Amino acid sequence: MIWHVQNENFILDSTRIFMKAFHLLLFDGSLIFPECILIFGLILLLMIDLTSDQKDIPWLYFISSTSLVMSITALLFRWREEPMISFSGNFQTNNFNEIFQFLILLCSTLCIPLSVEYIECTEMAITEFLLFVLTATLGGMFLCGANDLITIFVALECFSLCSYLLSGYTKKDVRSNEATMKYLLMGGASSSILVYGFSWLYGLSGGEIELQEIVNGLINTQMYNSPGISIALIFITVGIGFKLSLAPFHQWTPDVYEGSPTPVVAFLSVTSKVAALALATRIFDIPFYFSSNEWHLLLEILAILSMILGNLIAITQTSMKRMLAYSSIGQIGYVIIGIIVGDSNDGYASMITYMLFYISMNLGTFACIVLFGLRTGTDNIRDYAGLYTKDPFLALSLALCLLSLGGLPPLAGFFGKLYLFWCGWQAGLYFLVLIGLLTSVVSIYYYLKIIKLLMTGRNQEITPHVRNYRRSPLRSNNSIELSMIVCVIASTILGISMNPIIAIAQDSLF
């Protein structure tokens, strides 16, 4: 009899849980429609992989790309809708979050064509690669809209775990295994530090997990100026610093960039930063609203260290991917200026604008590196000498992307940095902007050094890799070259027509 009653209670509880989940999905599911498209794409990929043979491989790429494009379209149709909080306060939909989701989807859409030829040449498992990319994208999108500490952590780990698996995808490569181990250990440590900071917020706010409720809880408990908030701020800043590759938490970045497959590095170099920036803007702006002076100071120190160390160490590198790793550390130092300025002086708008330009510049550079690596098998900067004599199109494309990264006019990188530094100057961050200008000059030096190598025609400087360089048939590399052309064009002309981009970014601010 007792067993019968317990069984009935279990059935009733299960039914209630199911009905509540069904109610949430029915009424709140439309608010995560772009994410649902990606989930449907993931299911389709699994079904095709289980029921098809090698002849259906193009369908896998088609489904992945189509689901990403459809998700972008769904986001665009939802633009300028009223902000909504759904799933019992766990997820927030507004224009500011959707801008970051759009950037993550754009990165993934451009990265898949970069991977096609590389995967075929290295004989990597295609389905699993695409699954990890889409799942990481999904985690990044949920991270952009997460509105409570638990959802933030789950979405962050969804993205991070896929990143670890992607970095070690070429498991027969010793460097890839080493990169994965370092990435996993450092990433796990940073997540632990971040969660420890979250636990302080949870305790000080009286047991609240929603971001806005944490602020209310801190006011009610009179803990918003307590030493505990400073402890939480330090731990959360360190955790986010690892995710953003800010100095001095950047140690994992060069090894992961060098050891991971190049398309994976291209993907991680932009999506991880966009997702972490989406998290940083909300974490610092909402729960730490009363500690703005403290986190401004912390971020200023990290930005200065990143700009100086990243650009100075990049000069000494001999590997193209390691050079871009240190360059990315310097670049994120510039972006931090936008976070410090905030939405009062267009800081967030300048950050979003520069990240859009950075995506095109960085992915264009990596597209060139993928092509060169497939045709020569090397990543050494010295081996790029004389490339212009063999492949002028690739050499010019790489030169334009590097010049844009350096911030030379009239390319997009120049206008992006100009807007970012101008916002910083207007906000009174004079020292930070001066450091940014000086380190930008340093970065131009090592970018020009590579471009000089590309354009050299002296035989004694040309290595056997370029001397024996052979262009592959266009048909085999058209997807990589398509991504490269799109990124090069964007890196060249986006800055000239940046006013509409700035207007959209300003319109998204909460």
From Swiss-Prot:
Reaction(s) the record says it catalyses: a plastoquinone + NADH + (n+1) H(+)(in) = a plastoquinol + NAD(+) + n H(+)(out); a plastoquinone + NADPH + (n+1) H(+)(in) = a plastoquinol + NADP(+) + n H(+)(out)
Enzyme class: translocase
Pfam family, one: Proton_antipo_M
Molecular function terms, GO-annotated: NADH dehydrogenase (ubiquinone) activity; quinone binding
Biological process annotations from GO: ATP synthesis coupled electron transport; photosynthesis, light reaction
Residues annotated as transmembrane: 31-51, 57-77, 99-119, 124-144, 149-169, 184-204, 229-249, 261-281, 295-315, 323-343, 354-374, 395-415, 418-438, 484-504
E.C. designation(s): 7.1.1.-
InterPro entries per UniProt: NADH-Q_OxRdtase_suN/2, ND/Mrp_TM, Ndh2_N
Topological type in the membrane: Multi-pass membrane protein
Keywords: Chloroplast, Membrane, NAD, NADP, Plastid, Plastoquinone, Quinone, Thylakoid, Translocase, Transmembrane, Transmembrane helix, Transport
Gene Ontology cellular-component terms listed: chloroplast thylakoid membrane
Compartment(s): Plastid, Chloroplast thylakoid membrane
Subunit structure: NDH is composed of at least 16 different subunits, 5 of which are encoded in the nucleus.
Described purpose of this protein according to its UniProt entry: NDH shuttles electrons from NAD(P)H:plastoquinone, via FMN and iron-sulfur (Fe-S) centers, to quinones in the photosynthetic chain and possibly in a chloroplast respiratory chain. The immediate electron acceptor for the enzyme in this species is believed to be plastoquinone. Couples the redox reaction to proton translocation, and thus conserves the redox energy in a proton gradient.
Similarity comment text for this entry: Belongs to the complex I subunit 2 family.
NCBIfam families per UniProt: NDH_I_N, PRK02504.1
Protein name according to UniProt: NAD(P)H-quinone oxidoreductase subunit 2 A, chloroplastic
Gene: ndhB1
